[in-house]
Amino acid sequence: MKRIIIIGATSGIGLEVARCYLKDGWQVGVAGRREEELEKIRLSAPGQVCTQTIDVTREDAPFSLEQLITKMGGMDVFLLSSGIGKQNLSLCPDIELQTAATNVSGFIRMVNAAYHYFEQQGKGHIAVISSIAGTKGLGSAPALSLIHISEPTRHLRIS
């Protein structure tokens, strides 16, 4: 059975992607901050879902990913779907720093961990979901434009 891990699977696009993969018969690892939402997903497909509470802003998030990989017996696809975006008309630094902690530091932390896992395994796929605001820019939320940090990783290959 193929295995996908989705970080940010408790709502939105991440949740819908998890449902699609479950429907296609994959083993799905779901992760996010809200334990009660993770449990609902697990109960919706007994035996097909593994859960792990992961907050990508925490330094121990890669260790939590390792725990989820172990529970699942491996990982074939990694999808990062966690992200936040808030209107910030006053350009309050705290709002931008919170966004950067999730969307930039969280990206670096989690994609790095997945990449090194796949490097050891010799294969695997990494996908990242972002916002259109990242490509167009949004004056009231400048940190959303930081998705471009992922561009250089698109062409990395594990041989």
For each feature predicted by the language model, list its residue ranges.
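Conserved glycine-rich cofactor-binding loop
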Residues: T10-S11
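Conserved glycine-rich Rossmann-like NAD(P)H-binding loop of the short-chain dehydrogenase/reductase
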Residues: D24-E39
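Rossmann-fold cofactor-recognition segment
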Residues: A45-D60
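Conserved NAD(P)H cofactor-binding loop of Rossmann-fold oxidoreductase domains
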Residues: S81-K86
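Short alpha-helical oligomerization interface
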Residues: L89-A101
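Residue(s) in the substrate-gating loop at a strand-loop-helix junction
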Residues: S131
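Single conserved hydrophobic/aromatic residue that forms the stacking wall/gate
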Residues: I147-S159
